[in-house]
Amino acid sequence: MTADSTEIPQLALPLSQSPAAGKRARRILCGVDEAGRGPLAGPVTAAAVVLNPRKPIQGLADSKVLTAKKREALYDEIVEKALAWHVAEATVEEIDRINILHATMLAMQRAVQGVAAQGVLPDLVQVDGNRCPQVAFAVEAIVKGDALVPAISAASILAKVTRDRQLAALHIAFPQYGFDVHAGYGTPQHLAAIERHGVTPHHRRSFAPVRRALDGAPPPAGDAVPQTDAKTAWAD
């Protein structure tokens, strides 16, 4: 699949059924994670990282438990020391066209393809969560992998820092929405800004609060975003 493809990606076979499983000793591990599944605006971002065992990185952890300052410092160290890394995304248009789950898988596919394009071919791709994208390598899902597997922790940091930077840039273009504060998540501040200023081209029209705003419907009682549409601002 090319970087511009919007073909709906298939979920991977479980590791035991993957044709690549068991063919080689697993020495090159590639961690994969995403940021931005839940927000009402902006792309969904994914990163793939192959760490260099000869250049250990101290302090790797789930990006959600790190301060922004610590994430930025680790980002610089990861891109300097990793054997290979790549950050990719699926656009708002792709999210609306194929849904957020498939768009997330697409971004992950692109991230792994970016690592492979550097000549680093993983023996095993380890993905945070309970679903895997279909890639040309053995792959396994690890629930809470961003807290358990260093390469996934590194990927979570690259994905989150990249997406936070994108939303900070979006704030400069649309300061009235407060993207620098909520990163596109459905906070009361963001919902109020949508009601007051309308929807930007960067909002996900397939998400219910945005769709309601476009239809002119009032927000539901309590003015809260349903959990099916968004997670908290610290969830990625």
From Swiss-Prot:
This is Ribonuclease HII. Keywords: Cytoplasm, Endonuclease, Hydrolase, Manganese, Metal-binding, Nuclease. The keyword tRNA-binding does not apply. Residues 27-219 form the RNase H type-2 domain. One of its GO terms (cellular component) is ribonuclease H2 complex. Residues 212-236 are annotated as: Disordered. The gene is rnhB. It comes from Ralstonia nicotianae (strain ATCC BAA-1114 / GMI1000). GO terms for biological process: DNA replication, removal of RNA primer; mismatch repair.
